[in-house]
Amino acid sequence: MKSIKREKLSILTNFCDKNGEIPDFGTTLLGKEFTNSLSEEEGLFLNYGQRNSAFPYSQQNQYGRELKQKEFLSVTLENEYLKAVFLPELGGRLYSLFDKAEKRELLYKNSAIRFCNLALRNAWFAGGIEWNCGIPGHSPFTCSPVYAAVDEDENIFRIYEYERIRGITYQVDFSLPSGSRFLHCRSRIVNPTNNVTPVYWWSNVAVRTGGNNLRVVAPTNRAYTHHNYNVITVPVPEYDGIDITYPENSPVAVDYFWKTRPDAPLYMAAVDGEGKGLVQLSSSRLKGRKLFSWGNGKGSDHWQEWLTHDGDDGKYCEIQAGLAPTQYESLPMPPNTAWEWVELYGAINLVPEKIHGKYTDAQSAVEEFLKTALPKDYAENFLRQTAALAKKPLTDLICKGSSWGALENLRRKTIGNRPISQHLQFTETDDGVDDWKNLLLNGSFGEHNPLVAPKSYTTQTEWINSAEKAIRGKDKNNWYAHYQLGCAYLADGQIKKAAERLLTADKLVVSPYVKCVLAQAYLSQGKKNKAASKAIESAERAPDNVEVCQFAAKILFQTEYYQKLYDFTHCLPEKMQKNPRIRLYSAFAAVEIGRAEEGEKLLNLNGGLCIPDMQESEITLGELWFKIRERKAETTGEKYTRKYSDIPYKFSFQMTNER
């Protein structure tokens, strides 16, 4: 028995399909690099392929906290033992994997799709299995539609996309064969370019914790982690006085990348106190395995509640599988190459004593289970047997992704090159590639209204070369061409060249968007006064645009011009002043210029300041709370000592040791 079904699924969500208007290049364009204390035998590609932003992808930051019911397209694969539910409009996320025999959910299934700021594009949501390809961090498509197609005869559900930062295509073919107790996930990445490119893949699996004595088992006795960005190896299972294979033992948020044994099958299992849980097995290419624990602090608890519907979905951890040994790196992928692998996900049910005793006994128990559940070398054999099927075109397209794959094929056609991944159907959708098509076919971007936000960007070398040619010809006096080049240079770290193009654009037209990016260029050069001036100018040109005004306030906050920030926010319309981010910056400014009581009032107004897109690792609310107490203590001559444990729960987002 097997079936594939598509239907609408109603889920609570704060989903917003409107993207941000201002491109993001990271805070300072200077990301933190990893050092290491590893032996020369480790051979990690540390820092290779790391990025500071998701540019040219737009930010997905226009959501609030209010949840409403919304219907999402879902695809369900089902057989006698398992039921798998996917969401193609949200990166192809595996939303649920249900064990029919035990009548239990194998994943952490979030009752709400609640966007929060944990990804390079901002929006991310917890739960299920996420398929992360391209750049380090969460997939650029994790909260976006991807291409999805079905083949009911073969019982295959396929997701795929063109990832334009790396210039690669990826696809995952999902199947649930009749009689199988494992969901089959067959992945394929193709580098169709003539260049070596950094490639990143991690399958991110959320599993429930919260008092269930969950233990994570993998074929390892060492793990990679980092202390203050210095990568080290630590023993498994005992490290620093705790058994790190139990996620709930960790006092703080932490990543452990299991150093898998070369002689063992590549698996990971998350098994609770009753001996029940989820097991994953892969073919040989997918060597990396990871455990992420949120830790046990107040801030960690708050984050898990923040990601759910009022915290009523409980706690979770993540077990992950990747191409590289760690997420501190990408792997160099040769030109014109395909990488393929298979993952299998299913239920595991063992005697609890075998799992919750010696770690070597737990490993043996899982490995014996896999030997019994699957034929020898099953994953490798399945990979070979489905090689032709993976290149079969699927014509029943049920969800469309971006237009960039179709645009790349058009670009290739004009120079006589073959299309990318010819068995994958890429179409044109309404996501703003017309500018680039015009550049390709006519040698010009054409005219653009400087008061309307540009819809799309790129950093691909071929397009940048075309834009550079355009400003020497038809687009010499076209602000938009200079602006696009300025953005591309800034993303590439060519800050001087970026500033030159952006200054040219700023002289040609009055555009708040040019001024916003120019402010970021100045900030990255350390020219704080110029950055602040351009930020204020951007808001003056778009006084009714909340995003532009919020951006201006952010730049003034980053440059620490607190009096200017205070004056700026207090000149905004009352409705604009209520924006959570603007209110936060205004409160900081008030405290820094000696108005601590005013800052405290802004912080506590209406039950306390709530920032919908509070960023992972951001502690601005706690910092503001501390500063208010320090300023008050100064006025009375008292000494104030910071203690993270004192921060009220609603303002607590730190994931470090509380002291």
Label every model-predicted segment.
Residues K2-L44, V75, E89, S96, ...:
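A contiguous, surface-exposed recognition patch within enzymatic or periplasmic domains that forms
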Residues E78, A84-E102, I159-G210, A218-R222, ...:
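Acidic, contiguous internal or C-terminal segments within carbohydrate-active enzymes
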Residues D475-K476, V509-V510, P543, Q577, ...:
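Short coil turns that delineate tetratricopeptide repeat
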Residues V75-E78, F86, A148-V150, S187, ...:
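Short Pro-Gly-centered flexible turn/kink motifs
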